């Protein structure tokens, strides 16, 4: 069950249709070794599409867990997204990003909702 519309609006939540997520993942991801970030993963529409794309390219579950990171503020939505295999961090994106620029992680691809990402 998705959160009520008013809650989504307050937190900036928008759920991308599966076909759009698949199209963007296919367009953006070029190799099975890309380090990929989804900065506002919600319930995992893009995370699922990213994992599917990487599996089709021959990536293992272990490499997907290592190479794909989703960030989601909402604990319930982060839990839903984590079922698709990649690493999902329950955090504010800006807090997570600060750790990245401090040298913890770099990414080749950023995937997410158009026109927001």
Give, region by region, the residue ranges found by the protein language model.
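SAM-dependent methyltransferase catalytic region
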Residues: 1-117
